[in-house]
Each structure stands twice: as structure tokens, then as C-alpha cells.
């Protein structure tokens, strides 16, 4: 696809994308009877919604009995290989506040998370992820969601030239002393993957990213588009127990939260496959 505001191909894609903007969270919601034994019809519905919106929210009537059941569920959707992070060293990460000074990652605290895509700092691209709620926070903790394809659409319609944000050196991730990760230079938008679909690497946290001189102004415009022009497209939702989110690694964030007697606990799976 030619990515300019004057391209017939792009304008056709942009028009089709506009037709599939969710007007409310219910358009993303699928009721499933049992997360431990998801029916074929329920899986089909989830896949259809993800194909349309790059995101789906499911709600199970039954408690999750084991992590292996959750893995079987995501494999039926399309996940096959997984990112094992440095905290849990497992296919499934437990996202809950931790009382150890060794853990400085914001997801494992009660703090807010600004707009980002998962794994933007990794060499290998994360194409999809799941969050499953075991226990919600007593106050706050809402997730906010924004289809990255809508961000691309808005950027091109308002600025025309996207090429600088597709260069490998557009986004610079500083080295991490916590994980011994070297500095990474990468793209923000790319179609150069096996799926020929949009993949995005980005974070709104200023301490986490830098930019090339060429891309600096474009990134400033991108941030404005995410915060202002795309605000109408973002959806906010607080997961209840036995609910979850599946996405093609769209932009997302989290409000800060407070816990009462039971800590907020989510299970996270990140995959190298697109759904």
C-alpha cells in the first residue's frame, strides 16, 4: 500500500477503517461459557472481532482452573510461540504489585501506565498479547485501548508523509542497566513482517524512548495525534474477574489503582504471532 494521503489505495483503506471504528466497548465483547473449555463458535466470534478491531474483550462465566487451560485457549486463537519475560521466566506473567525493590517495572506496581505497545524495547517483535483478570483492583486500574491502525490513519491524513517514522532509526530505546539490554534503534510503524500488516513500536514515557534528529518533529506530531485527535477512538474498560483482553498489540495503557484486601492480579501472555 502506498502510504500517502493522495494514494487511492490508502484512501480506500482509510475509508474502510473508518467504517469499522467501535462506537462502544460492547462491540468488542464476547461472552464465553467456560474459559477452560471454549467452544468453537466462541473462538470463531473472538477471531472475527479481532480481525475487525485488532482487539477483543471476553467474559467467562467460569473461573480459570489452570494456566494450561489459558494457554490452550490462546493457542486456539492463534498464539504459538511466547515471550518469556525477565520477571517470571514463564509463558504466563503474573501482573500484580510486588513488594521487592528489585522490581522497578511499572506494570508490577500500582502506578499508571501511559500509552505504549508491548515489547517496543525488544529485538523480537511482539505481535499479540492477552490480559486475563483473576482479581480486579478495588479502585481504578482501568485499561485504555487504541487501535494502532487508526493512529496511522490519522497521522497520514493530517501529515501525509509517514516514511520517517518507518525508518529503522526513528525510535531509540536507551540501554537498560536492569536487564543488561543494549541500546536499540528501531521503527515506529512497519509493514515489513510475515503478515504484511501494521506493527507499531512506541511508548509515551519520555524516559523510555529517544528519537533520531530526523524523526523528532514527526514523533512530536505523533504524540499529539495519540493524545488529541485519536481520543475519540480510544476505549476505556475495567476488567472484572474472569474477563480478558486479546489484541494484535494495539496501543494501550492503564490507570493507577488501589487495592483493598485482595491485590489486583492479571495474567499476561505475549506472543510472536499475530491473531
Spell out what each predicted region is.
Residues 48, 72, 163:
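Surface-exposed charge patches
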Residues 2-43, 90-239, 244, 250-275:
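Active-site environment of non-heme Fe oxygenases that use a 2-His-1-carboxylate facial triad
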Residues 59-62:
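Structural motif
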Residues 64-103:
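Long, hydrophobic, well-ordered secondary-structure blocks that form the structural core
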Residues 47-56:
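TRNA-binding/sensing appendages of the translation machinery
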Amino acid at each position: 500500500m502506498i502510504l500517502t494521503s493522495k494514494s487511492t489505495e490508502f484512501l480506500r483503506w482509510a475509508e474502510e477503517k473508518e467504517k469499522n471504528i467501535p462506537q462502544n466497548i460492547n462491540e468488542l465483547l464476547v461472552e464465553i461459557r467456560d474459559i477452560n473449555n471454549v467452544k468453537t463458535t466462541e473462538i470463531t466470534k473472538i477471531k472475527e472481532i479481532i480481525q475487525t478491531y485488532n482487539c477483543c474483550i471476553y467474559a467467562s462465566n467460569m473461573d480459570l482452573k489452570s494456566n494450561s487451560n489459558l494457554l490452550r485457549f490462546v493457542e486456539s486463537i492463534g498464539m504459538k510461540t511466547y515471550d518469556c519475560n525477565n520477571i517470571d521466566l514463564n509463558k504466563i506473567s503474573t501482573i500484580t504489585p510486588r513488594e521487592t525493590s528489585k522490581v522497578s517495572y511499572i506494570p508490577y506496581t500500582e502506578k499508571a501506565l501511559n500509552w505504549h505497545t508491548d515489547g517496543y524495547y525488544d529485538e523480537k517483535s511482539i505481535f499479540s498479547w492477552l490480559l486475563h483478570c483473576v482479581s480486579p483492583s478495588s479502585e481504578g486500574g482501568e485499561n485504555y485501548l487504541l487501535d494502532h491502525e487508526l493512529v496511522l490513519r490519522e497521522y497520514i491524513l493530517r501529515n501525509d508523509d509517514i516514511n520517517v517514522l518507518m525508518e529503522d532509526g526513528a525510535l531509540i530505546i536507551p540501554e537498560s542497566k536492569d536487564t543488561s539490554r543494549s541500546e536499540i534503534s528501531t521503527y515506529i510503524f512497519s509493514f515489513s513482517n510475515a503478515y504484511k500488516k501494521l506493527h507499531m513500536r512506541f511508548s509515551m514515557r519520555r524516559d523510555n524512548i529517544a528519537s533520531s534528529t530526523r524523526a523528532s518533529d514527526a514523533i512530536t506530531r505523533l504524540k499529539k495525534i495519540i493524545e488529541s485527535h485519536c481520543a475519540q477512538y480510544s476505549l476505556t474498560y475495567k476488567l472484572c474477574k474472569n474477563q480478558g483482553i486479546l489484541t494484535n498489540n494495539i496501543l494501550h495503557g492503564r490507570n493507577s489503582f488501589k487495592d483493598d484486601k485482595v491485590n489486583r492480579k492479571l495474567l499476561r501472555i505475549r506472543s510472536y504471532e499475530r491473531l
